[in-house]
């Protein structure tokens, strides 16, 4: 049986939650391998709607959830999320959730620095969620992070906090923000330890056992390829690598761990916050896409920017992300539009490009080259087979396949998990 990684192929918010939920019902284990609680999934199960930011989506299907070492974990946010879903009747405990003991912790000072920096940027804001993800990754790379395993060694925490505060309080003071007292942080960590440590273990060992037992593993990515810290629209990106290759390192498994990479893309484009967006629409069509698609962020509540499908961007995501099949979502949002446009290239300073350059100045200057297609008047909502789709809708999907150079293996036609057209089963490789 194949192990599957699911990643976003645009700027996030592509509908990964529904697709992951659909796949999780057929997996044995669901693994988070990067990011933090800065991205959200909305899952509808029966009459319950779950909003998850840190917990693996498979938990709502009764599957084992694993948070890998590549994730930065805010312990307060984790416990709050567990309490919230538990109040909805979902049992989450050490039997159903395991967390890598070498995962980095997000502390209150990380969020404080995140917000202070963003405020200091003024009009040049990156658009972070202010939840401390970036500063926590900085500490990890600088080898001063406090990790979950450190909670089991309280005698070492004081010295580690000294090093941490030497760095962060200097930054906070320079930004004119309030600094932190060591004792308050130490007391908080000591109080959290007995609540967090029961979930901790070297998850690489468990995942090795799961793999050798032939069980199905679903790797659940957060954010998307175009928010990757290396391959995205830098500096308007997240602080981790979001491509499928990260699934191995972020969970403690080797590169052979992933057999199939499924990329999620909307049938149009959206983006939250700042950064280049060549196909963004500022007219009534853009408003229509936002209203029909209910385009508001799960975590921030911010209205998403909307535009036409960018085949150049998604093709690039396919190549650098290792995507072998696309799950195309929200096709029904395009129902009734008389004309559709797909971006097939960019004009930048008089030159035509079939890629998004790395230079921020070139990205900001990119003007889309469009190909127009006839829309469809019929409804695609709730379609569960190709026969249910209007002919023009099928043509639109086929053209996306041609331009992105990857097959559409799954098509979503409504938020309902059963309104899905399966072309190829990702778990069959």
Swiss-Prot record:
GO MF annotation list: adenylosuccinate synthase activity; GTP binding; magnesium ion binding
Family from the record: Belongs to the adenylosuccinate synthetase family.
Cofactor note: Binds 1 Mg(2+) ion per subunit.
Chain residues that bind IMP: 13-16, 38-41, 129, 143, 223, 238, 302
Function: Plays an important role in the de novo pathway of purine nucleotide biosynthesis. Catalyzes the first committed step in the biosynthesis of AMP from IMP.
Catalytic reactions of this protein: IMP + L-aspartate + GTP = N(6)-(1,2-dicarboxyethyl)-AMP + GDP + phosphate + 2 H(+)
Protein name: Adenylosuccinate synthetase
Residues where Mg(2+) binds: 13, 40
Residues reported to bind GTP: 12-18, 40-42, 304, 330-332, 412-414
Organism: Granulibacter bethesdensis (strain ATCC BAA-1260 / CGDNIH1)
Active site: 13, 41
Keywords: Cytoplasm, GTP-binding, Ligase, Magnesium, Metal-binding, Nucleotide-binding, Purine biosynthesis
Self-association and partners: Homodimer.
Chain residues that bind substrate: 298-304
Cell compartment(s), UniProt: Cytoplasm
SMART domains with a match to the protein in the record: Adenylsucc_synt
